Amino acid sequence: GRGAHHRAHPAFAMFAGLPGAQGLDAPALQAWLGVGGGQMLWDDLGAQFGFKPLVAGHTGPSAGLWAGARLETAAEFSGSRIQVAGIAADVVRALGAVPVDNIDPSDLRAAFADGRVHAAELLGPLAVVTSGIEPLAQRLYAPGINGNGMLLSLQVRKPLWDRMSTADQAIFEACAAEEYRLSLAEAQAHALIAAQVAGPAKWPVRLAFSGEVASALAAAARDVVEQIAATDPAARRIHDSYQAFRGLMGQARIA
């Protein structure tokens, strides 16, 4: 689902991670927060709701969208029950799908079997291994919808944060940053473990989204992000900063 902070203010989604090409990958997101002005904008937004936000982890990139049936056309999304995180729920809803709240990986195989879910994007490589969904979700559409993965945050109550010394605040920030670094290392290691466990299995069949579906998802993602930006002036400032940094990253990759 969207999470409590998104419900408090839609612009919090900009810090958690955006779907498709609208989003920054984990290193770029950290760069925007650390030196691109993102943390100051996040601090301002968090202060309105009484907390100081810190980066404290990341899921790593998504393996893709696991599906038990074909999702080759936009029409095939219609009525499909799809588990996705964050504002990707609004993206699949735009294609006529029914977003499903996060199901525990241990229950996901049963959810596929009884029709509670038809497709799921699992963030974290070991979630796939522990869920055992491969025989039921035989198609893996990569890179998925939240291809860049999602940031995990730590919120410190603002009165507590303001009472801390500068040194204590620096310790908190350093520990949170180290957790972020370790989480990315874990995600990379877990992806290798997951690949080894999977071995030369028949399933899943790895597929790219069709041009029709990719275009529909991209258009929906742009619309959803623009709706967030239109919430209020604070959301517009966050959006413009994020997208300007995304543009710089794109130019750097081309160069």
PLM regions and their residue ranges:
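N-terminal secretory/targeting leader peptides
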Residues: 1-28, 44-255
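Soluble or luminal CAZymes and related metallo-dependent hydrolases
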Residues: 33-37, 187-190
